[in-house]
UniProtKB/Swiss-Prot annotation:
This is Pentatricopeptide repeat-containing protein At2g35130. PPR repeats lie at residues 154-188, 189-223, 227-262, 263-297, 298-332, 333-367, 368-402, 403-437, 438-472, 473-507, 508-542, 543-573. It holds the Pfam family PPR_2. PROSITE patterns: PPR. Signal peptide: none annotated. It comes from Arabidopsis thaliana. Keywords: Repeat. Gene3D superfamilies: Tetratricopeptide repeat domain. Belongs to the PPR family. P subfamily. InterPro entries: Pentatricopeptide_rpt, PPR/CCM1_RNA-binding, TPR-like_helical_dom_sf. The lineage of its organism: Eukaryota, Viridiplantae, Streptophyta, Embryophyta, Tracheophyta.
């Protein structure tokens, strides 16, 4: 009988069933030993077939048990072997997913016998938690193994912990574990370096990621022999943070220069990268490249490619990829269908998206929450707010709880219709359903009130944001500056501009362009140039919108020529800020 107070009762309820299914030797509270079981287990091979394996025979291989071969970053279990969770492992998993108290976890795990089978169960549970993205739970289990258990931790345990801390942006803890690994005289694996690099990239510390590559060379790993796992982790880590697109491309090019052959996963990452940057033509180019290199695309490749075209509303191209996927013998899953629906939604064809939705159901693929959200968005974009609400209600009827995004998409649909009453009702319903409106929702209401000229309500929301849990962000001020600019309240614009700087917000190109646009509407050409000079001096690069509002401020052909001349210099490497004072001087002379 395996009982250790209430904590264990919640984990091991049926002791007879426990012995019948698990049967390994366990010492109970009275010191008696439970009879051990036959060393036999089950695995699912790479073809999805259930097979038996002899745990005893496996445990006598190098390193013992599944140590050193049980888990590998990026591929689950090595050699296509995915051990099925044993009954005791399933109970451990269920308990760990609910428990957050380290002491209770230690009490329960401490009752496990110090056997290879227990070790395998713990590692299998940790890997399953990783698949479920339960980073806190992984930390609870692996920290217990490392600090408090009688088990001898191995590199797998360290790697799982480094991964979990990296995912939580706790790079210092990941770094500390790497140092501890070295001090414990373990040899870092390629996975160790890959996960540490990814942790640094996710934290925005690219320089430290480069240091890890140097560290690899110090351990006699030359640049030519750095594996694909490390490069993939580097690229993936850079992709986790906005603004690192060029750095990720550089790593991909370096990888090819070092003659490290990209894998399907590498190409999938890069196709996704270009897709998110709205460069579907580059995604397509990479797809063609991988085919020419005999690198076989998988379902994730096609999903990424359909998504790339979907973001630009290229539904015909997305459908071609969908057909190619099926010609290659792959079965579309819910993610592919969702991506194809998104392409029709972005292209402004809600009924096309609805046809894909029906096709998905007809083919036996169950729509998920994202599928319904896409349909709400598709109808909302087309101004069919009643249809959007019908999908929203159908989702609730089926027991799919609407998320913040679901409410936001419905809110956006009615906002486009300028239906204030309905929008206010949606926000109220969110609170009643336990989904508290966030800054994004309040910004949407702010924009709606502003567009309708209801400035009192707009200022009321701003006051709530200053005193409530949802604080204002740079988008809040961009909306306010744009609304007041269109209304001609120039003094209020300057007050808001000072206020956002006091709150340590950095004005972006939208902020500056909205501010210039306010003066442009009044044809205050010189003031527009002054603000433009401030913008350049602050290090903010103008875009097409900035050029448009500057040109609209011009009231003569000469002013148009002056502005055009300055804008052209942006593409010739000339310092624009040095030309603005001259332009202003000419303008004042003319006036």
């Amino acid at each position: 009988m395996l009982v250790a107070g209430n904590a264990l009762n919640c984990l091991f309820i049926d002791s007879s069933g426990f012995q019948r299914y698990l049967g390994f030797g366990v010492t109970n509270l009275n010191g008696a030993t439970v009879k051990s079981y036959k060393q036999e287990g089950f695995v699912i091979d790479e073809r999805g077939k259930l097979k038996r394996f002899n745990r005893k025979k496996l445990s006598r291989k190098r390193c013992g048990s599944l140590r050193g071969r049980g888990w590998k970053y990026g591929s689950g279990f090595v050699d296509g072997i995915f051990p099925v969770l044993s009954p005791i492992a399933q109970k451990i998993l269920s308990f760990i997913q609910k428990e957050t108290d380290p002491d209770k976890v230690a009490d329960v795990l401490g009752a496990l016998p110090s056997t290879h089978a227990s070790w395998d169960d713990l590692i299998n549970v940790s890997v399953q938690l990783r698949l479920n993205k339960k980073w806190d739970s992984i930390i609870l289990v692996c920290e217990w193994i490392l600090r408090k258990s009688s088990f001898q931790p191995d590199v797998i345990c360290f790697n799982l912990l480094i991964d979990a801390y990296g995912q939580k942006f706790q790079y210092k803890e990941a770094e500390s574990l790497y140092v501890q690994l070295l001090e414990s005289r373990y040899v870092p694996t390629e996975d160790t370096y890959a996960l540490l690099i990814k942790a640094y990239c996710m934290a925005g510390l690219i320089e430290r990621a480069e240091v890890v590559l140097v560290e690899m060379q110090n351990h006699h790993v030359s640049p030519k022999t750095i594996g694909v796992t490390v490069y993939n982790a580097y690229i993936e880590g850079l992709m986790k943070r906005k603004g690192n697109t060029e750095e990720a491309i550089d790593v991909f090019q370096r990888m090819k220069r070092d003659r490290c052959k990209p894998t399907t996963e590498t190409y999938n990452l890069m196709i996704n990268l270009y897709g998110k940057a709205s460069k579907s033509y580059m995604s397509w180019k990479l797809y063609c490249e991988m085919r020419s290199h005999q690198c076989k695309p998988n379902i994730c490749t096609y999903t990424a490619l359909v998504n790339a075209f979907a973001r630009e509303g290229l539904c015909e191209k997305a459908e071609e990829i969908f057909e190619q996927l099926q010609e290659d013998g792959l079965e579309p899953d819910v993610y592919v269908y969702n991506a194809l629906m998104e392409s029709y939604s972005r292209a402004g064809y809600p009924y096309g998206a609805a046809e894909i939705f029906s096709l998905m159901q007809h083919m036996g693929c169950e729509p998920d929450r994202a599928s319904y959200n896409i349909m709400v968005d598709a109808y909302g974009r087309a101004g069919l707010h009643s249809d959007a609400e019908a999908v929203f209600e159908e989702m609730k009827r089926l027991g799919i709880a609407p998320t913040m995004k679901s409410h936001m998409l419905l809110l956006s649909a009615y906002s486009k219709a300028r239906d204030v009453t309905k929008c206010e009702a949606i926000v109220k319903e969110m609170s009643e359903n336990g989904v508290e409106p966030d800054t994004f929702v309040l910004n949407s209401m702010l924009n709606l009130y502003g567009r309708l000229g209801q400035f009192t309500k707009m200022e009321k929301i701003l006051a709530e944001m200053e005193n409530g849990p949802c604080t204002a962000d740079i988008s809040t001020y961009n909306i306010l500056i744009n609304i007041y600019g269109k209304a001609g309240f120039l003094e209020r614009i300057e007050e808001l501009f000072v206020e956002l700087k006091e709150k340590n917000f950095r004005p972006d190109v939208v902020t500056w362009t909205s501010r210039i646009g306010a003066y442009s509407r009044k044809k205050l050409y010189v003031k527009c140039l002054e603000v433009f000079e401030e913008m350049i001096d602050s290090g903010c690069a103008p875009d097409g919108g900035t050029a448009k509002v500057l040109l609209s401020a011009c009231s003569s052909e000469e002013q148009v020529e002056q502005v055009t001349s300055v804008l052209r210099t942006m593409h010739k490497g000339v310092t624009v800020s040095s030309l603005v004072p001259k332009l202003m001087a000419k303008s004042l002379t003319v006036n």
